[in-house]
Design a protein with these regions (language model features):
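Non-catalytic interaction-recognition regions
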Residues: 1-94, 110-595
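Short, charged, solvent-exposed linker or helix-capping segments at domain edges/interfaces
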Residues: 95-100
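Flexible, low-complexity linker/hinge segments
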Residues: 101-110
Length: 595
């Protein structure tokens, strides 16, 4: 039973005894006492005045006095206007801690029976994953874990954007300047090689535009008439027509990229339950476009292009099929949404996509609604801010992007340098050290990104993220390692601290604070899931680690002479370490046994 429910239940008894009135505990308002007042939890008295026929102060004091006299778990009370602030006794906190320890599934919320699909990553197969993709992947993965922890059945999915004119640009550049290069012949990872071709296409395009302008053409026209751009569109038409030569090159280069993606995902600890490919889904969208034309929802212009007019809804006309018959990005989004809701009987669908696509998802939901799909209301766009570096925004076509692979390697090196400086790993094997460096580096990267509210644009600083002090992943990892070290020392001394039976002891103020914080874990999971914000869990883990370190600084745990108190303290910190593991596990971050 939660503290809130306990108070509501006992307050209901008090009201019956004092005013001979029946009131359901669920009808009473109980919340954590605000910091400026003295108390643990507060009961709102105002709604009870109709029963007491008295003032808020008299009513609050009467209920408080009854609770103090009849409920041993309540030690003190004070009434401020219409708010009854209650303090729990030592007995209550012992009992609550016992319940937490006994609950092997502590933190897991009841099963909802809901199916939720989370789409994230969704990269283009014309470049490697970069820092922006990392935020997307880490958000998508942690939100999926968070929704699962809150009782939902979660399907993690990605849509690989493996077709379109942007893919053809890399293919065309490879034909023009690639000289037959392969990952094997160059030693370059496949996704990086294809990314180099995308940058090369942009160089070719810029040169052609400059030449056209020099020949007297205006800039706007030149950008549309550049020969290589026309060739890329022609290649896309050939691809959609099934041209064997184009399809073979496409399959070959896509294979290079997908293999590279798999290596990057593995390094990040990212997996998917279902992978969709745009090349296999874009035709689904075309079927819906035909349906929309038949329904009169879409219109076909004289040039053959198909549009949805959303001006009456405060938006623009939206292109669905180009005049040359090729589809645009939203076309396949319509088709895949329909397929997913039918295939997985979804209750909701979360798209993790950057905030530059806010308009796109407004349009997507509106068009699906116009097509008669009521489930469109259950689509949620988890819009997040961009990741920036001191140099500013990243642009793939200019080759100024920070690659995910390079960043992961940099984090590994930062973790190694910081760990080696401490000199605490001298007796660890090189293999174990390498695993630890990867765990710390990845934990630093993930935590630094996830702790920021998804809606906010953020600046990533690798060196700051690896700091063993402050609000960082390594600080929490180090805290966990410190707890495990204390428990190992206890075992070496032959101290047993099995949680059952748990002795009831006089708890210190800091121990009560830790128990309070532990108790809020399920509520934090619910709060984070409702807001689609793993930052809630990240900051909870930091608060817990910070509170433990203060406790450890002030409390000589292993020097305690009272056996019951010593046992309680060891069980307390063991429980803390378990909750830290669970919280950080939601973020996809591992915690080491030693650092």
């Amino acid at each position: 039973m939660t503290p809130e429910l306990f108070i509501a239940s006992k307050a209901s008894e008090a009201i019956k005894a004092l005013y001979n009135a029946d009131i359901e505990p669920s009808a009473l308002q109980v919340s954590v006492t605000r910091k400026e007042f003295t108390g643990d939890f507060t009961l709102v008295v105002f709604p009870l005045l109709r029963l007491s026929h008295s003032t808020p102060e008299n009513t609050g004091n009467a209920i408080g006095e009854w609770l103090k006299a009849n409920v041993p778990e309540i030690s003190e009370y004070n009434c401020v206007k219409g708010f009854l602030n209650l303090l729990f006794s030592n007995l209550f906190w012992n009992e609550l801690f016992g319940e937490i320890v006994a609950d092997k599934d502590f933190g897991d919320l009841p099963t909802t029976g809901k199916n939720i699909m989370v789409e994230f990553s969704s990269p283009n197969t014309n470049k490697p994953l970069h820092l922006g993709h990392i935020r997307n992947n880490l958000l998508g993965d942690s939100v999926s874990r968070l929704l699962k922890a809150s009782g939902n059945n979660v399907i993690k999915t990605t849509l690989v954007n493996d077709r379109g004119v942007h893919i053809c640009k890399s293919m065309l550049a490879w034909l023009k300047v690639g000289n037959g290069a392969t990952p094997e012949s160059t030693g370059i990872k496949g996704d990086h090689l294809v990314g180099d071709m995308y940058v090369a296409f942009n160089d070719i395009y810029k040169k052609e535009v400059e030449d056209l302008i020099a020949g007297g053409m205006d800039e706007e026209t030149a950008k549309k008439e550049a020969p290589c751009l026309k060739e890329a569109h022609e290649m896309l038409q050939k691809w959609e027509a099934g041209d064997k030569e184009v399809r073979d090159l496409w399959a070959r280069m896509n294979g290079w990229v997908l293999k590279g993606f798999d290596e990057s995902y593995k390094a990040l600890g990212i997996t998917f339950d279902k992978v969709y490919y745009e090349s296999q889904t874009y035709l689904l969208g075309k079927e819906l476009v035909r349906k929309g034309l038949d329904m009169g929802v879409f219109v076909k212009d004289p040039d053959g292009s198909v549009w949805c007019d959303l001006t009456a809804d405060g938006l623009d006309r939206k292109l669905l099929i180009r005049s040359d018959g090729t589809s645009v990005y939203i076309t396949q989004d319509l088709g895949t949404a329909e397929r997913r809701f039918a295939e997985y009987h979804l209750d909701s669908h979360v798209y993790v996509v950057g905030n530059e696509q806010n308009y796109h998802f407004q349009v997507l939901k509106l068009i699906l609604k116009k097509l008669g799909f009521e489930w469109s209301d259950n689509i949620f766009h988890l819009s997040y801010g961009m990741v920036e570096l001191p140099e500013g925004k990243m642009k793939s076509r200019e080759g100024t992007v920070v690659d995910a692979d390079d960043l992961i390697q940099k984090m590994y090196e930062e973790a190694r340098a910081t760990s080696d400086e401490s000199g605490k790993l001298a007796d660890m094997s090189e293999e174990d050290k390498a695993k630890l460096y990867h765990m710390i580096g990845l934990g630093a990267l993930k935590y630094f990104i996830i702790k920021v509210d998804p809606k906010k644009t953020m600046l990533f600083n690798p060196k700051e993220s690896i700091d063993f002090n402050g609000n960082t992943g390594p600080f929490i990892q180090y805290t966990h390692a410190r707890i495990r070290s204390i428990l190992r020392k206890a075992a070496e001394k032959g101290i047993e601290y099995a949680a059952s039976p748990l002795p009831k002891v006089e708890l210190s103020a800091k121990e009560i604070r830790l128990i309070k914080l532990l108790n809020t874990f399920p509520a934090k999971i619910a709060e984070g899931a409702q807001a689609y914000s793993p930052a809630v869990i990240a900051n909870y883990a930091y608060d817990l680690a910070k509170e433990f370190n203060q406790y450890y600084h002030d409390t000589p745990i292993l020097k305690e002479e009272n056996e019951d108190v010593l046992k309680m303290r060891l069980v307390l910190i063991d429980t803390l370490s378990a909750v830290l593991r669970k919280a950080m596990g939601i973020l996809g971050i591992e915690l080491p046994e030693r650092m």
